[in-house]
A protein has these predicted regions:
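Internal, hydrophobic cores of structured domains that mediate oligomerization or house catalytic pockets
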Residues: 84-197
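Extended intrinsically disordered, low-complexity coil regions enriched in Ser, Thr, Gly, Ala
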Residues: 68-96, 126-142, 184-206, 254-276, ...
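Exposed alpha-helical structural elements
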Residues: 9, 26, 33, 129-133, ...
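Surface-exposed polar/charged interaction patches
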Residues: 16, 20, 37, 44, ...
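C-terminal structured domains
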Residues: 192-341
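An N-terminal, globular interaction/scaffold subdomain
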Residues: 1-115
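Short, hydrophobic/proline-enriched secondary-structure or compact coil segments at domain edges
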Residues: 46-48, 52, 58-77, 114-122, ...
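Broad, structure-driven detector of short, well-ordered beta-strand segments within folded domains
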Residues: 48-66, 100-113, 159-165, 216-235, ...
Length: 341
């Protein structure tokens, strides 16, 4: 009977996703880098939430986002992509002991061999009081003011929930994000309503064509929609706007139907029509899977260990009103389901 580490599970998830020739088509040569550089980030008693991000148009590559829920004190990550992150991890331990449903983590860019320092991510949700201590913990205290100022001027229906940044890059934007209520998504199907929201928040890098594309995608979005904006160092908004359309597929066995003639297929088909995706999106259900194998738990008990990879959302993005290549996001999960003596 084998014991499976988080690093082992991560390798299984990536290799299975890339099997049957899908690796070169979906992830390109960065797959090998993603397999290697993410291993030091597989920390904690529980397997983290791992998101695999790949484009649906253009040269294939794979980026990896790793988000942590509960972490144990004293955990460190030994990676040049996450220098001096100990204070951030200790902050996260304290925040989770005091507040529920808070997560933070890293986004690993493996597209190029140079491997830049990972971006950091924080999801305070409604706990706005956590923004300043997080930014201080990652050595970017001035970013907190940008988030808090932006949060104050957002309409209630466009409230902020999470943000990300590159440390040590003074000119890089702060990415702020939030979830749109269902009623607001339905309202944004009307381009004039969407344009009014953009004017309220101070976003001007759009045209009528972009409004129509955003509205049409919201009309076919299967479930939750979140938005993303870039806040520049002077507090103004950058030229990029994005939405994530959640697939909300409940079970692995439902993936194929969703991508054949269901809600996911309608979203992907629209992205292909707009020139933001090509036929590779049809490989997404083929890469999805769920498996269980016998394994030994850390306490020596025997049980079933599960591996699951499912598509979670697709990102549509516009810069200066021009639609960019869309990206698909898989959620990779692993862990013991049950044990017995």
């Amino acid at each position: 009977m084998i014991a499976i580490s988080h690093a082992d599970a991560y390798q299984v998830l990536l290799l299975q996703a890339a099997d049957d020739g899908r690796g070169p088509q979906l992830f390109g040569e960065s797959l090998a880098r993603a397999r290697e550089v993410a291993q030091p980030f597989m920390v904690g008693e529980t397997f983290p939430s791992v998101y695999l991000e790949h484009p649906l148009l253009g040269d294939p590559f794979l980026d990896v986002t790793i988000l942590y829920g509960k972490l144990e004190p004293g955990i460190r990550i030994d990676s040049p992509m996450a220098p001096a992150c100990g204070e951030m991890l200790e902050w996260h331990v304290r925040a989770n002991s005091e507040t529920e449903n808070v997560c933070c983590g890293f986004e690993l860019d493996t597209k190029d061999p140079s491997l830049p320092v990972a971006a950091v991510h924080c999801q305070p949700r409604t706990h706005i009081e956590l923004v300043e201590p997080f930014c201080e913990a990652v050595g970017e205290p001035e970013r907190a003011a940008l988030y808090l100022s932006m949060s104050e001027r957002m309409p209630e229906e466009w409230s902020l929930s999470f943000f990300g940044m590159f440390r040590g890059r003074p000119g890089s934007p702060l990415r702020v994000c939030g979830y749109l209520p269902k009623d607001e998504v339905e309202a944004c199907i009307e381009p004039t309503h969407l344009a009014e929201r953009f004017r309220e928040i101070g976003f001007s890098a759009y045209d009528d064509a972009m409004l129509g594309q955003v509205a049409s995608l919201m009309a076919v979005a299967p479930g939750t929609v979140d938005f993303q904006l870039d806040v520049m160092g002077d507090g103004t908004l950058g030229p990029t706007f994005a939405i994530d359309a959640q697939f909300e597929i409940a079970q692995p066995e439902a993936v194929c139907a969703a991508f054949t003639d269901g809600p996911a297929a309608r979203v992907m088909g629209l992205l292909e029509k707009y020139g933001a995706a090509d036929e590779r999106w049809h490989l997404v259900p083929e890469a999805s899977f769920a498996r269980c194998i016998p394994a030994e738990a850390p306490d020596g008990k025997v049980g079933r260990y599960s591996f699951t990879l499912m598509p979670q959302w697709v990102k549509a993005r516009w810069t200066n009103g021009v639609m960019q290549p869309a990206k698909n996001y898989f959620l990779a999960k692993a862990g013991m389901l049950e044990t017995k003596e």
